[in-house]
Amino acid sequence: MAFKIIASQCTQCGACEFECPSNAIELKGEKYVIDPKKCTECKGVFEIQQCASVCPMPKTCVPA
Amino acid sequence: MDSATWEKIKDHPCFSEEAHHYFARMHVAVAPACNIQCNYCNRKYDCANESRPGVVSEKLTPDQALRKVVAVANEVPQLSVLGIAGPGDACYDWNKTRATFERVASEIPDIKLCISTNGLALPEHVDKLAEMNVSHVTITINMVDPAVGEKIYPWIFYGHRRYTGVDAAKILHEQQMLGLEMLTARGILTKINSVMIPGVNDLHLIEVNKWVKERGAFLHNVMPLISDPAHGTSFGLTGQRGPNALELKALHDRLEGGAKLMRHCRQCRADAVGLLGTDRGQEFTLDHVPLEPHYDGAKRQAYREVVARIRDDHLEAKEKAIATVASANIRGSLQVAVATKGGGRINEHFGHAKEFQVYEASQTGIKFVGHRKVEPYCHGGWGEDAALAGIIAALDGIDIVLCARIGDCPKERLMEAGIRATDTYGYDYIEAAISALHATEFGTAPSQATA
């Protein structure tokens, strides 16, 4: 499983990028994208998914 | 004020009301990520015409920021301060803040570095801020009671998790106080920004003022909430209103005697460029900036020499004017609105003014009390009636308007609304003109000093 970012709602603040413990998030062109191969949903590292937890926009960083 | 403190603030427009007539700041939007949510903030929308903290048109990488700072430094001689003030938090988005400051400081060593932060991640970076010679820090503190904070902050992100409610506000409060104390201990000047939210924290800000004064805050800036449904902020959508100019002034007056107040804030955008009250940001968007500008400090150097020469003259005239008004010992007070482009003089045309600076002449002397934003009366050479109606409304409570030039038509319309306007004192120093005006008004000119 992985998380994804709903690009139309994303403000591109980039907080998720530097909170992600797996380096799974990067800015590709005009949007932030989560690499599903790298995303671990923070299992074993943090109790709560860091990207969704830090995201300022409701329902923008969600389970894929 | 001791001379060491004066040295620190004399060319920082935000930390010194006097300096803001001469010096300019620029903000670079390199730190878009934020670790808290505030009910008055929404980072999703931008409009070039909107003057609102947190709003920017383009986010920059540290390299792009360096390009922009060099280009502005070459063109804007008044530039003295580089700030990072959002749209996110300069301490949370730390790597970008640090990289930007390091690059700019090596290129332009004499520029003052300044950040604005919510304080949550501040304590962990105070030592590095001191090491990088960041001389001025602004912390936004809206409460010292988490029960009040809960109404302003829906959540914070701290220690890898999201906190809500009173828990969130309590952590934020503790970090803010700790950060402020740490900065004071290192001799870094702090300004506290507070957003006045009627019915939520307005009277509570009296308590905030006491707390921050005790912890060494240099300046307290109480700003009105900007709230409009079109901005899409939580407060905008729930109909929470901002205070009007008179409510804000009443709170400012109650805070007199506590931590020193900042009254000349313009609540500028997080990518503003230029003197306070003007924003030249649109002239310096990335597509207007050379790819590899080379820093040329000649204009800034020449300007500083001019300011050093004229400043003492201005200060002397100002002090004399204030003393004259105070010694006249008149009970009544005079509310004066001034159109100015800077330099401490009445040098803006009425029709071109985007704001009026408000001064009060009273028994205590001449005091700057704030400013009123307006839509300029003249668009492309002729006046617009709708704009004039807006200006008259914005000048509520003003006795006299001073400007460099004014036409007969707007002058008459102002008079009908009970506001006098004159260009008699055009290009004079502001305080000297107000002093002369005060003497005429109350009949205390030396030749007829009977009152």
From Swiss-Prot, chain A:
Co-factor binding details: Binds 2 [4Fe-4S] clusters.
UniProt keyword terms in alphabetical order: 4Fe-4S, Electron transport, Iron, Iron-sulfur, Metal-binding, Nitrogen fixation, Plasmid, Repeat, Transport
Biological process terms in GO annotation: nitrogen fixation
Cofactor(s) annotated in UniProt: [4Fe-4S] cluster
Keyword flag Nucleotide-binding: no
InterPro entries: 4Fe4S_Fe-S-bd, 4Fe4S_Fe_S_CS
Residues binding [4Fe-4S] cluster 2, per UniProt: 20, 39, 42, 51
Binding site for [4Fe-4S] cluster 1: 10, 13, 16, 55
Listed Gene3D superfamilies: 3.30.70.20
PROSITE patterns recorded: 4FE4S_FER_1 (PS00198), 4FE4S_FER_2 (PS51379)
Sample GO molecular function, one term: 4 iron, 4 sulfur cluster binding
Keyword Electron transport (UniProt): yes
A matching Pfam family: Fer4_7
Domain 4Fe-4S ferredoxin-type: start-end pairs: 2-30
UniProt name for this protein: Ferredoxin-like protein in nif region
Species the sequence originates in: Sinorhizobium fredii (strain NBRC 101917 / NGR234)
Lineage: Bacteria, Pseudomonadati, Pseudomonadota, Alphaproteobacteria, Hyphomicrobiales
